[in-house]
Amino acid sequence: MKVAKSITCNSIYTEVDAIMYDNGKIYLGLSGEERVQLPLSMCNRHGLIAGATGTGKTVTMKVLAESLSDAGVPVFLCDVKGDVAGICAPGADSEDMQKRIERFGLTGKFAYRGYPTTFWDIYQTGGHAVRATVSEMGPELLSRILCLSEAQTGVLQIVFRVADDRGLLLDDLKDLRALLNYVNDHKEDYRMKYGNITTQSVAAILRALLPLEKEGGELFFGEPALDVNDWIRTDAEGRGMVNVLDCVKLVQNPTLYASFLLWLLSELFETMPEVGDLEKPKLVFFFDEAHMLFRDAPAVLVQKIEQTVKLIRSRGIGVFFVTQSPADVPNTVLAQLSNRVQHALRAYTPTELKAVRVAAQAFRENPAFNAEDAIMELGVGEALTSFLGEDGIPAMVQRTKIICPQSLMGAPEAMTRAKAILRDGMEKYDEAEDNVSAYEVLADETQAAEEALAQERERLEEEKRAAEEEKQRRKQAEADEKRAQKLEDEARRRAQKLEDEERRRAQKLEDEARRKAEREKEKKEAEEK
């Protein structure tokens, strides 16, 4: 067998055997001289990796991820501290590592190597963009992210209902903002159909969007939305793709972090077909800082998580919760986690001692040691383990020294990470798309309404102008008529005056003629006498 001392991410996989995965089982470590193995077919029965800070949870998670990748199973890892990213690069040799390699019986077989890795980052700095649409997130999870009251959540549900009924796509936060304003403007129209919508609740939701946008919501919500099928890939050599989500910044917003992970689970459940129990899972998720999923979560949300975890196994999906104490996970969810790795817990208070006792009682008893005492005695890289056997029965708890990973412990060099990002084939997510959605539709409607209103105003103004012109015309006509009547009356008076004067003149002439005739007659008579 040819052994390579150091193999990079794009090396020829056939140069080494998958030393920690063999015959359908994952080699996780040693209990004494006995190999502790996890059947691959049981990985979709979910699991728990718990332990105090610095006890080796990350190493356990990486060892499982490497073996799953070797088995051709894609993996999802949350990188909370930045050290998980080293899985893309070969590990570094040291004297201590050589001792561990010898201790686990891997001398001559062990090879440092990186694994096929795709980096993702909601903030788009440490990997490809991860986006979801507002519609996909849904009102329940969005209400939790925004810390809305019951009344405000009810209004948000109405807004989503209006979007569904109108066929409006809610891709990003500007779509949601536009629809909130639209619903508020038309609340009287929607009141009878959907219920009461108050301006105060709408204003509160709009205010809650401001910090979300500032914390990365503007980057997270949009298109192209993540296609979960892009996480279910293998490389050219058949190794499962290791999808690493950069959570160093995201985890600083626990509510957004938890809501994103829950959305992811729900999306997988709704997207993936029913397949039942398989020889190996289609995808395995490791959710670090799992306690954030349940912190301050309402009962209905915890119930949804329980239901999703319970049913997603039939989709061929395995889920491992990684947290400090089993007490961080509700009992209803804890009951679904059949594969357990318990690292050391530190207990000083009654509450902490009770948590240790509960953690120990979750294991099938081993008469060789006391599990409760062992949990507090475990060293770094050591754990109590219990996995389902191939018959589905939990094995007795074993005190196990966890095997060493083949990839780099710690963050890789920036160039190594950059090269992995460039060659993973997921560049389609790097550029945001602004498709026609609620914002554009409502903007067009608003513009059309404004144009129609402007046209109506112009029509009314035109009618007003026409009426005013008609009024002026009639007024002018009346004035002209009065003026004409006045002129006619004046002409009639003048004509009458002229006629009277003519009559008087004629009468005067007639009288003068008569008097003249009389004078001439008198003169003639006088002459005749």
Model regions and ranges:
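Phosphate-binding P-loop
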Residues: 30-31, 36-44, 237-238, 277
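Conserved ATP-driven motor cores of ASCE-family P-loop NTPases powering translocation/secretion/packaging/pilus
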Residues: 63-65, 88-109, 307-393
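Conserved P-loop NTPase motor module
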Residues: 2-15, 20, 129-135, 376-488, ...
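Membrane-active amphipathic alpha-helices enriched in small hydrophobic residues
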Residues: 526-529
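P-loop NTPase motor domains
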Residues: 65-75, 82-307, 333, 376-378, ...
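The conserved Walker
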Residues: 49, 53, 326
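N-terminal pre-Walker A segment at the start of P-loop NTPase domains
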Residues: 16-35
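Conserved lysine of the Walker
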Residues: 57
